[in-house]
Amino acid sequence: MRLKPKLLNAIILGLTMFLSMQTAFAACNPSMAIQQKKVATVGKKRVAISKKKVVKSKKRTYRKASARKYSHRELNAIMRILERNFLSEDKTPALRNVVGFGMGSNSIDVALRWNTKEKQQEFRRQIYNSPAIRFEGKLDPIIDNREGVSTYQGISLKAEKPSYPLGTTEIKFTITNHSGKEFMYGEAYSITAQGADGNWFVVPTDCSFTAIGHVLSDGQSGTITAHLFPDILPNKPGIYRFFYEENIDGNKVLLMATFELK
């Protein structure tokens, strides 16, 4: 049976959105994360290493669901509208704040990069409003007062520069291997800032990460690139903490580097 071009394109679009949503939800919700293979690149060689990588993020909670029962057709119609908005080239801050959405049993579940009551209302005003929309995750800000170490058994982490302009959206960090053996690192990270009350909280950053490992020989350095979203949450002057967590010699280690925005 030959499929008409329009039908084939619709099927491809649906599969693409499903896969992208699974990636985003897996990154932002531990309960939806799955075991993945971490691929190491050594020169031109590729080595597949089985490794569970679960990204720490927001706990999954549910808002009060509507008493109304929605049909699959109704939910699917909302999904199509959200897909068209999400794939639009004109990404507004409200759209950039959306990291994924999917169809539940009686709802459309939406994950936001910065999940506050105000941002939820912004979504309903600017993107789509329906009682079927339910927002995933704990409300921000999420407190994270952890501290890490800058060096552990020869593995060190630091920002490429000690300070950056206030409007910065991309920051690079250097991870260096002086452990005496090969070291493999990934791309997942988190960033915290200090609030007015003295507590540190998680700021909106990337929410999905490629499950790939980069291998450093002894003496080599690599780069981890982080992003900030000042159009979603304005950057404020001050010190920020960048975290990279890895298993080193069987120990769960939280590496930390600081940088300043001014």
What is the predicted role of each segment?
Residues 69, 112-116, 179, 187-189, ...:
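A mature extracytoplasmic/lumenal domain signature
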Residues 62-79, 134-147:
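Short proline/glycine- and acidic-rich turn/helix-capping motifs at secondary-structure junctions
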Residues 206-232:
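Intrinsically disordered, low-complexity Pro/Gly/Ser/Thr-rich segments with frequent PxxP/GP/PP motifs
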Residues 2-26:
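Sec-dependent N-terminal signal peptides of Gram-positive bacterial secreted proteins and lipoproteins
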Residues 142-210, 215-216, 245-262:
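Primarily secretory-pathway and cell-envelope proteins
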Residues 235-245:
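A short tyrosine-centered beta-strand micro-motif
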Residues 24-63, 145-159:
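N-terminal, intrinsically disordered, polar/charged segments of Gram-positive cell-envelope systems
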Residues 40-43, 49-51, 58-75, 92-126:
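Short glycine/threonine-rich beta-strand-turn micro-motifs
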